């Protein structure tokens, strides 16, 4: 029997034939999101999962962000502009995902900017309290209008692993990222993940798996996802 085959139970009641099938197959829509620090492999895993599952990928709008290069040159000056751009971009993306009614895998969530990047910039003195409060009130409004992903896959990685992967992909604007900046982000990611209750959560330890180069490691991740996805709609 093929994996995607439907299983039907036929029950005759008052000459009426009733068909039953698992709820998982009733769901045409599913929203999976990949979360993780800079260099954790979100975009790579998004592409690999989209190819494997035939899901529609939605990528982070990083390369087209008009503030990104300026931000890494002068974080204090451009932090608010950058975060508002990302927030607006991701809000529009989530709206599009929910209206599309497809199985989607998304590169980065709307929550990461609000609970990790923006408060980290504020704590480091790189975003004023006025700008941060303005930003967060805007996020809360947008958050009230969107639904959480059905499953978040969090890519956990140590700072050395992040640095290695950042250097490997060789983006010029990331050359100035400091180690303490990545460390602070990691700490905030862990704090957020331990309190996340918006939906299902799967944690993948990137220090232990290399899904970008190892088919065996990718297979491990896929099996972990299968176990979660198959239980989403029970």
Segments and roles (model prediction):
Residues 13-26:
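Short, positively charged and aromatic/hydrophobic N-terminal segments
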Residues 34:
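Hydrophobic anchor at the beta1->P-loop junction of P-loop NTPases
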Residues 51-89:
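Conserved substrate/cofactor phosphate-moiety recognition/catalytic segment
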Residues 37:
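P-loop (Walker A) phosphate-binding loop of NTP-binding proteins
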Residues 163-234:
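NTP-dependent small-molecule kinase module
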Residues 42:
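Conserved lysine of the Walker
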Residues 115-190:
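A glycine- and Lys/Arg-enriched "phosphate-lid" helix/loop adjacent to the NTP-binding pocket
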């Amino acid at each position: 029997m093929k994996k995607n085959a439907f299983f039907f139970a036929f029950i005759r009641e008052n000459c009426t034939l009733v068909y039953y099938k698992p709820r998982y197959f009733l769901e045409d829509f599913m929203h999976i999101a990949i979360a993780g620090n800079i260099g954790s492999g979100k975009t790579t895993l998004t592409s690999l999962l989209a190819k494997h599952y035939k899901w529609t990928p939605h990528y982070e709008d990083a390369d087209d962000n008009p503030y990104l290069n300026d931000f890494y040159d002068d974080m204090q000056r451009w932090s608010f502009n950058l975060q508002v751009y990302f927030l607006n971009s991701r809000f529009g993306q989530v709206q599009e995902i929910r209206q599309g009614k497809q199985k989607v895998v998304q590169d980065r969530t709307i929550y990461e900017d609000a609970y990790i990047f923006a408060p980290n910039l504020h704590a480091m003195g790189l975003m004023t309290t006025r700008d941060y409060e303005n930003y967060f009130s805007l996020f809360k409004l947008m958050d009230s209008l969107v639904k959480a992903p059905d499953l978040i896959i969090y890519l956990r990685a140590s700072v050395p692993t992040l640095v290695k992967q950042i250097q490997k992909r060789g983006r010029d604007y990331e050359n100035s990222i400091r180690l303490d900046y990545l460390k602070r982000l990691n700490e905030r990611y862990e704090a957020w993940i331990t309190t996340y209750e918006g939906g299902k959560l799967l944690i993948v330890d990137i220090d232990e798996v290399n899904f970008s180069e190892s088919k065996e490691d990718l297979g491990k991740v896929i099996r972990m996802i299968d176990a979660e996805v198959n239980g989403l709609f029970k």
